[in-house]
Amino acid sequence: MAEEERTGRLGRLFAALVNVGDEDGGEASPEGAGPAGQDAEKDLAGGNTTVLDLEGLSRSLASSPDPMALLAGLVVDVRARVGATGAPELPGEAPKLPPSPLEVHLATRLVEAGLLEADVELPGVRVVRPRTSGLFYLRIEEERVSYLAKLRVLQVESALNSVLLASRALASPNDAPLDAIVRAEQRVTRSVAGQAREVAARLEGPVRGEWDVRYALAYGIEAFRLPHRLTARFRVNARAGVAAFELDLVPPEAWPRSAFVDGLGVVPATEQMRRRAAGTYNARLAALVAGYALAAAPELGEVWVAGVIDTARDHACLYSARISREALEAFDLGGSFDPVALLRSCGAAISPDETGGLAPVRQGFSLDDETLCPRERYDAPELSEATLAGELGDALGCWRVSDLGIDEGARRRHVADELARHLTGSTEKNVQAILAAAREDGHPDVIEAARRCVSGLIDGELEDDALAIGESFVEGGDLQRGCARARDALLSHDLEAAGKYATDALLPIDGLGSFDGSDGLVWRGFGSYADRALYNRLVAAPGERCALVPAAYLEAHTIAAASALARGRAEEALEHARRAAEVAPLSSQASLNLAQCLEATGDPEAAGRELCRLLSLAHDPESIGLGYLGMAQLQWQGGHVLTAQACYQRATRHLGAPALVARLAMAALIGQVGVSAGGELSPEQADSLLEAAGIPLAPTETVSAAFLEATRAATDAGIFRVARDLLRKLCMISRDDVYFGMLRSVEDEPDR
């Protein structure tokens, strides 16, 4: 009889090792099944145990300066109480209760994750619970960590999330025996693909267009509730109906080291069991992301998915598939299915090895494939002849793509890039090539640049070097050269020379009123595509025609203002600063310089109005922070100490490196105000003070709404130079994980 029982146990363990249908270490038995004695843990100390408060643990981890040490302390405490009877160890002491099976299981998973190992130093982490998933996220605080250290952090995170998800799958997790907890964990891993439609149903409104599809996919990656962190890179071409994912898979060595096997209970997981379980789970991830993408975005007809593993030594692709909507509809992702068979039915490259794990295969696509990343997305807006209609034009404030341009020299730059392919070491051939390029383009600006370069080559002032010729072609005008001399003088702290070079460069232009504008034409300069889009939406007059000034024009006025102010010539500085702010109304630097010059000329009220104008249009953290710092100084000098404190507090919310200075100033303010201020103001108090003083709360609702609409429109229109700049700043302000995911999905500009 004993021999039969031993043979039966070995048979069941062998089935757990090799049976593909019995996934994740064995199918869960019906509730209540399993070896006798599994429920005996509940009888320790008369059924009295401590309980695992996961929400309380989450709060403690989030506030802890060393979450790993806190978790290590939890493990030590649980181990010390295993076997406790519930009776006091010494007279007068409180009873020592044993841990619940859930506590024991969490401690076990943390030990399996290597939390207590000393072979690698774990990096500093911060624990957060993202709102989209509600899971634990261990954010590594150090820029560079070893592969093993990162793997350990991810394993600790997985231990926390596995227990969290298992506890949600149990009716009474703190009363559940160990086998029920482990079986619940395994049910969670087997059912991950079933959440695809449920998560897709949370999206608001129809998903249409490039922006909506990218938002939906980024949201899904953040919202999936998975026991192991999902790191995914993706690309989208909504017009072509295609999305592609590259998933970082779970390596077998990161898989739990114990599993439930039907008839055996919880047993140590062999290497083969872990390879098979990890391989099956990783294949399910492909079904999850493809199923979600197709459910969330009706415009998509096909989803490409590749699963990869990067270790300290190599990179491997474990599967590569192109999953069509029709192929996936044959499977019920919410039911029981074989994920490897699903991928094979879609024509995937996938190769299970003899252990049940996945062997490396060739990846069938790249995230940079032109199908996913059409090159025309990065065509220069300045040179575009495309038009914008309907909602796209309304959102971007213009009807021509070229009216989103910011680079006055874009045409010269384009011709110079093409010209570089035909330049040689021969002056004669270079002159011929330059003149031919100018004739082919025909634009007066290009013809003038060509004449300038040809003259320089013939006179010997310009070398027969492709880089030198290209630079002269684009930035070789009198204004640019004069501005460069002024910049060099300013960097050398020669203020007199800097001012002279700048004003000399500006004299021929401003003396003739070249950029004064008339008959609805205005001349403007912009530092970013985001600035231009907001200018179109919120500043430009109806029917206005906007031409671009060279960047050197704005820089020359800025240098002239700084030089004059440093030499005590406040009125002269004000004239230059006012012109710079007029030409670049979205430039925070021009606005700050103007406010400083107004204050220097004895007009703090005008300086305050200019800073209010800056804050009413500010849309990035640096502009907002510096605007509030400047306003705080004015308020402090005017005796409005509480309002100044409110400005400093708003500044610290947006600034990076200068925040320390702002905090020190705020501390000085709090000390000056004393008891009457009650210390630091609450956000509500600070906002009320600013509103009462007529100071905008940046970014304003108007700016935020226009910014989001413009970002969406530029993405849908496929104007990615504009879209990426807008999206980057949207991320900086919102700090929203979904927007960051969208930003990562935007490909880099292709080589041309």
Language model regions located:
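Long, charge-dense low-complexity segments
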Residues: A2-T427, A449-V454, A466, G470, ...
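Alpha-helical linker/edge segments of TPR/alpha-solenoid repeat scaffolds
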Residues: H443-V446, V454-D465, S472, F526-R545, ...
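"A position-specific structural signal for the A-helix of alpha-solenoid helical repeats
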Residues: E448-C453, E463-D465, G477-Q480, A484, ...
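Residue at a conserved register position within TPR or TPR-like alpha-solenoid repeats
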Residues: A489, A564, L598, Q635, ...
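TPR-repeat structural position
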Residues: L495-E496, A570, P604, V641, ...
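Short coil turns that delineate tetratricopeptide repeat
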Residues: D510, A551, P585, H619-E622, ...
